[in-house]
């Protein structure tokens, strides 16, 4: 789900503007009154949180376009990760892939709930 944010959603500029390759996931965020801009960047081997804002709640960005996580916080993640990947001593690989356990079935709980005919169990 969070990979789609990068591949075709609000964090798409990681691919297009910053030319980032490999598997990435992320979540952009903006708080009320454009006070804070967030970006959570996830790679197979590293998780990053970027926040741009002020401790004083009276401080805020002038507009929604400037206060969005994709506008203010995402570029910090992109530039940081470009430098991480350039530094071979750190050992991070831009071509790493997300690893799932062999027996992982994201729909198993749905099938069990439907078999029990208890739709409420799905939403607990």
Feature locations, PLM:
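A penicillin-recognizing enzyme superfamily signal
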Residues: 1-123
